[in-house]
């Protein structure tokens, strides 16, 4: 459950380390869950990388601390809130993705991110 002003870890090698959610895309939504696209501002970044501090970026939420219930009755929860920075075509800005991701991203057509991930839960 991600809302505005929420800090998220960045789980790729685009250069950003932490982003803060400033808007949730897709109608008048208060909260974002796994697979939702948000707009965020980079709060912490690695020097000499493509994404700089204070850049406004699009990102897709890939892990949340809030439990997500699936249709088959199973629930899944992660240890952190994490996102992957994407471009306008929903392709990741980085070339690697760190940590596990949820199966819900495959259902929402983020197949490039799913293919880069080391583990899909």
UniProtKB/Swiss-Prot annotation:
GO terms for biological process: translation. Its main location: plastid. Pfam families: Ribosomal_L14. Gene3D superfamilies: Ribosomal protein L14. Keywords: Chloroplast, Plastid, Ribonucleoprotein, Ribosomal protein, RNA-binding, rRNA-binding. GO terms for molecular function: large ribosomal subunit rRNA binding; structural constituent of ribosome. CDD domains: Ribosomal_uL14. It is found in: Plastid, Chloroplast. One of its GO terms (cellular component) is chloroplast. InterPro entries: Ribosomal_uL14, Ribosomal_uL14_bac-type, Ribosomal_uL14_sf. NCBIfam families: rplN_bact. Belongs to the universal ribosomal protein uL14 family. Binds to 23S rRNA. Part of the 50S ribosomal subunit. This is Large ribosomal subunit protein uL14c. The gene is rpl14.
């Amino acid at each position: 459950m991600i809302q505005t002003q929420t800090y998220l870890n960045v789980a790729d090698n685009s250069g950003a380390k932490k982003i803060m959610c400033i808007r949730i895309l897709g109608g008048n939504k208060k909260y974002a869950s796994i697979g939702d696209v948000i707009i965020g501002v980079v709060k912490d970044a690695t020097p000499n990388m493509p994404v700089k501090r204070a850049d406004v970026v699009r990102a897709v939420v890939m892990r949340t601390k809030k439990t997500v219930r699936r249709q088959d009755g199973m629930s899944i929860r992660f240890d952190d809130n994490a996102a992957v920075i994407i471009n306008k075509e929903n392709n990741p800005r980085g070339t690697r993705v760190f940590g596990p991701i949820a199966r819900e991203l495959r259902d929402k057509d983020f197949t490039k991110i799913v293919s880069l991930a080391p583990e899909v839960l």
